[in-house]
């Protein structure tokens, strides 16, 4: 018995679109390229109409009774569909969770750097996980870490809103911030 191959080297089976001769339904509801109904006609007559106009007969909906076909230029239609899909992919931004780590005994300049990082992440539309980690007996000062995280949330309140308040998780205290959808309106002091 020959050994079984480790990988399937065959190319994947591509689903071919139902156009022209690949349409197997005997009766079709046909719509022309302008959107005008041509009525329910048999398949051969619909193919003849499409070839006279030098266009393709494309199956639009096979769930309908009878199935709906459209007379159109399939190459142009396929190009436009790919273009729309590409635009949609370009516009959709995958939200990531970026992390900003620090200790509760952080220096002023280091804190400002973390605020700058968090601001950059929030402006690019990502969520921010603020983590304060403890070493050894520092865990006894979790109240100082919570104060630090709340101060950070307060400093970033123009760009963000608290998604999850500070809470302890093992040897860390974490807080999640998400980008603010609407700009914060500051109240006038006076």
UniProtKB/Swiss-Prot annotation:
Organism superkingdom: Bacteria
PROSITE patterns registered for this protein in UniProt: IF3
Keywords associated with the record: Cytoplasm, Initiation factor, Protein biosynthesis
InterPro entries according to UniProt: T_IF-3_C_sf, T_IF-3_N_sf, Translation_initiation_fac3_CS, Translation_initiation_fac_3, Translation_initiation_fac_3_C, Translation_initiation_fac_3_N
GO molecular function terms noted in the UniProt entry: ribosome binding; translation initiation factor activity
GO terms for biological process, alphabetical: ribosome disassembly
GO terms under cellular component: cytosol; membrane
Subcellular location: Cytoplasm
Complexes and interactors: Monomer.
Family: Belongs to the IF-3 family.
UniProt cross-references to NCBIfam families, sorted A to Z: infC (TIGR00168)
Job of this protein: IF-3 binds to the 30S ribosomal subunit and shifts the equilibrium between 70S ribosomes and their 50S and 30S subunits in favor of the free subunits, thus enhancing the availability of 30S subunits on which protein synthesis initiation begins.
HAMAP family, sorted: IF_3
Protein name per the record: Translation initiation factor IF-3
UniProt source species: Prochlorococcus marinus (strain MIT 9312)
């Amino acid at each position: 018995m020959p050994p079984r191959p480790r990988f399937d080297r065959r190319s994947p089976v591509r689903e071919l679109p139902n156009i022209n001769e690949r349409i197997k339904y005997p009766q079709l509801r046909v719509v022309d390229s302008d959107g005008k109904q041509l009525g329910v006609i048999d398949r051969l007559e619909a193919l003849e109409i499409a070839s006279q106009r030098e266009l393709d007969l494309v199956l639009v909906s096979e769930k309908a009774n009878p199935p709906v076909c459209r007379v159109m230029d399939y190459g142009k239609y396929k190009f436009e569909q790919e273009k729309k899909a590409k635009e949609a992919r370009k516009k959709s931004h995958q939200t990531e969770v970026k992390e900003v780590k620090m200790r509760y005994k952080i220096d002023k300049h280091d804190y400002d750097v973390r605020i700058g990082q968090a601001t950059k992440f929030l402006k690019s539309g990502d969520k921010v996980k603020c983590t304060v980690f403890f070493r050894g007996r520092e865990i006894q000062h979790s109240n100082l870490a919570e104060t630090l995280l709340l101060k950070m949330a307060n400093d970033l309140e123009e760009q963000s809103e608290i998604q999850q308040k500070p809470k302890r998780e093992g040897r860390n205290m974490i807080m999640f911030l998400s980008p603010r959808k609407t700009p914060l309106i500051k109240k006038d002091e006076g």
